[in-house]
Amino acid sequence: MKKIGIIIVVLALIIGISDFAFAGSNPLKAKEKEVVNSFYAMIPDDHKIDVFKLHEVWQKAMADPAYRKKIYLIDVRSHPEFYAFHIEGTDHFHAGHMYGIPKKIKDPNAEIYVWCRTSHRSRYVAGFLYKYGYKNVYWVGPTTKNGKRYRGGVVGWAQAGFPFVNQFTGKFKIVEYRKHPSKKEMSFNIREFHPY
């Protein structure tokens, strides 16, 4: 009986280890990386910018309405992400609906800036826009400045201390961005009561 128990434990360990081994060598994950890199390669190097350059463009657009009408500042995060917070005065186009961009932006030479949470989705969108025939698309990616690493997208924008807005609170800054809340934060129960 003892031998059967040991055999079962050993088999369970072997199966568990093999699952991890196969998960690590997922050919589809490698192919996705290859595809996203092919889209990234389509973006000219001088059109790969960081949040500091985006901030300069954004400040100019906010100060000059005529310039703002000529450019497109597009956040490609999901709708809930955008509604939670976004960069003031920017446009929103969900990455999954990028096929609709040519219907809205008809000039292939339009100046277009795209970003997402960090930079992954926007790489796809920027690559697709170049495939569509746009010539002047800027992708907001990561950078290192004064020895500090900044992500691309709104995470990098928050790291740099730049402001956000939403429809509920107005303008604000995120003092610490975390993708995953702490255990303490997860322990808070928000009870919502409805009058109906």
Predicted features, each with a name:
Residues 54, 72-77:
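Short hydrophobic beta-strand that contains or immediately precedes a catalytic carboxylate
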Residues 65-71:
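Periplasmic peptidoglycan-binding/tethering modules of Gram-negative envelope proteins
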Residues 1-4:
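Positively charged n-region of N-terminal signal peptides that target proteins for export
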Residues 115-116:
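Short, surface-exposed ligand- or partner-binding patches at beta-edge/loop junctions that are enriched
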Residues 6-9, 66:
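Short helix-onset patch at the extreme N-terminus, typifying the N->h transition
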Residues 20-60, 67, 80-111, 120-196:
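Rhodanese-like catalytic fold shared by cysteine-dependent sulfurtransferases
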Residues 8-16:
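Bacterial N-terminal signal peptides
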